[in-house]
Amino acid sequence: MQIVLISGLSGSGKSIALHVLEDAGYYVVDNLPSALLLQLVLHLRGAGYQRVAVAVDMRSGSSIAALPEQVESLRGMVDDLRFIFLEARDDTLIARFSETRRRHPLADENVSLDEAIQRERDALASVAELGHRMDTSDIHANTLRAWIKDFIGAAASEGLTLMFQSFGFKYGIPLDADLVFDVRCLPNPYYDPLLRPLTGRDQGVIDYLEKVPEVGRMAEDIRRFVADWLPAYMRDNRSYLTVAIGCTGGQHRSVYMAEWLARRFADRVRVIVRHRSAARRVQDAPPAVSGK
């Protein structure tokens, strides 16, 4: 039996994740009081369900504090347990609530939206450490859907999934990064007018960067560091390791580096590549990721 648990901050996109899992054939349970988690799993296992997705969050009230202990108990009950924790920056969450005109579950006439978000973040801090964290700040709903589909694919495979994620420092460091490397010291193709509209996946940018010796040296240093420590992360029984590569705008250098590294590890572990900021060159500001 495979269980996928979904938790996270209100407004981070949990309902989108559940819809993707439901479309993929999972039996979905939303807004389950965390105190009923073990009882639900026992019932569904007895009924013959093989793939189940359950959302547990602050709507469970104070019982959410017991979730870490329940998750540990659950690990001994099922063959495969995966946990996704969705989060986003405060400014992103505020913008989403403003756009959708929904009320935060912890907000009322005496508690502002800012304060409600902080209270929820504090209350879920221990829950966030239980599984794979996804930072949905500044992304489209379709991008989140693709991420969840990647996660489902990783859940179907054994062992660790290594994720290389490019980003732009001017948009903030991804909240879900395990390792962060800064490549802003490398020459920037942005200042070449012909390369400015391209990304690090385009051949012109690749040729530009591969002519610079420092680029190759830094790429090899990062590769060696990840390779040296990857066995330790694998021994820790992690499902995901997210390596974030950042440049100024997340369009050229970091994209190139993430792609380069992904190719070097593709024959060792399952590899996923995400580019958080590169799409900004052709997209307007993304719409809110609606959902809980």
From Swiss-Prot:
Lineage top rank: taxon: Bacteria
SUPFAM superfamilies attached to this UniProt entry: P-loop containing nucleoside triphosphate hydrolases (SSF52540)
Binding site for GTP: 57-60
Pfam families reported in the protein's UniProt record: PapZ_C (PF22740), RapZ-like_N (PF03668)
Keyword entries, A-Z: ATP-binding, GTP-binding, Nucleotide-binding
PANTHER family: RNASE ADAPTER PROTEIN RAPZ
HAMAP family attached to this UniProt entry: RapZ_like
Record's function text: Displays ATPase and GTPase activities.
Protein name in UniProt: Nucleotide-binding protein azo0399
Organism: Azoarcus sp. (strain BH72)
Taxonomic classification: Bacteria, Pseudomonadati, Pseudomonadota, Betaproteobacteria, Rhodocyclales
